[in-house]
A protein has these predicted regions:
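Non-catalytic accessory regions of SAM-dependent methyltransferases
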Residues: 16-145
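Short amphipathic alpha-helical segments
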Residues: 98-105, 159-167
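Non-catalytic substrate-recognition/targeting regions of SAM-dependent transferases
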Residues: 129-136, 140-142, 163-232
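Active-site beta-strand-loop-beta-strand hairpin of nuclease catalytic cores
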Residues: 148-151
Length: 232
């Protein structure tokens, strides 16, 4: 997991700068898990959420998280419809949540797994982005077939869903693969208050079936659904 804590500030924060953002205030005594690096914030830990009503209702709105004494704790993606009310983007008061951050996180994830991609056969599925592990909560990306193949993305939280365009741009730039497909888990998306969508985000859709080799065993895989059957 990235070092979210670099540059953490607890006092003297310029709150005037953030007057257009949501402010999540954590109940007294409930900030311990955040101080220890826990990236999920549940409703039971939140004292109040201040900000514009439309931002409160929009899944993935960026919020400042503060303690009951108004000390900065984190920046997070807020979702009033989710059991996990907020997912931390960064514990660093100096790190803005913007296109540059998203692209930087995607690049770091791809660079981390570059060796695995190089070793993989063309008919192997490679995990390229692993959600919280890469500082991109709720984002899963698998690659198949290299630059001429397909990237399959799952946006399982409001924060990454709100940054979908920037994420796809960064994935294409980092892999050279222009075929990007979104596959969703209906139960997860529904629980996050997100629309149920499947389809190409860039380039072509995958075929109904591709050949997958895993641990020496061959499967027929539908990249669009994730379903596989033993190859005969």
């Amino acid at each position: 997991m990235p070092d979210y804590h670099q540059g953490r500030h607890h006092a003297g924060f310029n709150w005037i700068y953030w007057n257009n953002m949501l402010i999540i205030t954590i109940k007294q005594g409930k900030e311990k898990s955040l101080l220890e690096g826990q990236p999920w914030i549940y409703a039971s830990a939140i004292e109040k959420v201040d900000g514009k009503p439309q931002e409160k209702m929009k899944p993935g709105s960026t919020a400042i998280v503060q303690s009951s004494s108004q000390q900065f704790l984190a920046r997070a993606a807020y979702n009033s419809k989710s059991q996990i009310r907020a997912r931390v983007w960064s514990f660093d008061a100096n790190e803005a949540v913007d296109h540059a951050m998203i692209k930087r996180r995607v690049k770091l994830a791809l660079d981390k797994r570059a060796a695995a991609v190089t070793r993989a056969w063309r008919n192997q599925l490679v995990a390229l982005v692993k959600a919280e592990e890469d500082g991109l909560p709720g984002l899963l990306v698998d690659g198949y077939g290299g630059a001429e193949g397909y990237l399959v993305c799952q946006f399982q939280a409001g924060g990454v869903d709100a940054w979908k365009v920037a994420i796809v741009q960064a994935l294409i730039a980092g892999t050279g693969c222009r075929n990007v497909y979104e596959r969703c888990d209906p139960l997860i998306r529904k629980g996050e208050g997100l629309p149920i969508v499947n389809g190409a985000l860039s380039g072509d859709e995958p075929p109904d079936e591709v050949l997958l080799t895993e641990n020496g065993v061959r499967f027929a895989l539908d990249l669009k659904t994730g379903e596989r059957s033993k190859f005969r």
